[in-house]
Regions:
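Catalytic cores of Mg2+-dependent Asp-rich isoprenoid enzymes
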Residues: 1-88, 95-170
Length: 170
């Protein structure tokens, strides 16, 4: 793909002209693919906030950067805001899907925020809402949403860089 070849995959063949036309940066595509591959592991548990933010950058911050190219927003100052908006959206998704993710053996809440509870323990905590793990999970979700708000604020500052026609869609 990065060499400009799509092989036999029809989705990649369809993507290649857009990638070429919009000049998607290869390092951004690699980071996105790394994040998607990380999600394929049998068990996903993030150790700490740094791992959370690295994951969120890979699977969503990169999408913000790619959207800059799709929307023809080339101001260098816009990039950090685009990354932050993508990260904010991913953090919100993580907060929404804690139990669903735990059912799939995933825990995106940082282990340092939830006493390193594994996904099965997070899932079991739903049956004991007053238990210590449930309290830690609720506190972690609140902390996650607070962190997301900080990233949304930065993302919103970047709207001024968007072409006018893109404002409503973003």
């Amino acid at each position: 793909l990065l060499a400009g070849r799509s092989g036999d995959d029809p989705a990649l063949r369809a993507f290649l002209p857009l990638m070429t036309e919009k000049r998607f940066p290869p390092d951004v595509l690699i980071a996105l693919i790394d994040g998607l591959l990380e999600d394929q592991d049998d068990v996903v548990v993030l150790a700490d906030e740094a791992a959370l933010l690295r994951y969120a950058y890979r699977v969503a911050g990169t999408v913000g950067l790619l959207m800059c190219h799709v929307l023809d927003c080339h101001a260098p100052s816009a990039r950090a805001h685009a990354i932050d908006l993508g990260i904010a959206m991913q953090l919100t998704n993580i907060a929404r899907d804690v139990l669903e993710d735990a059912k799939m053996n995933r825990r995106y809440l940082p282990g340092t925020w939830v006493g390193n509870a594994d996904p099965a323990t997070v899932l079991a905590a739903a049956d004991d809402p007053d238990g210590s793990v449930a309290l830690e999970v609720r506190a972690a979700i609140a902390r996650l949403l607070s962190l997301a708000d900080q990233f949304y604020a930065s993302g919103a500052e970047g709207y001024r860089y968007l072409p006018w026609r893109a404002h409503m869609s973003i």
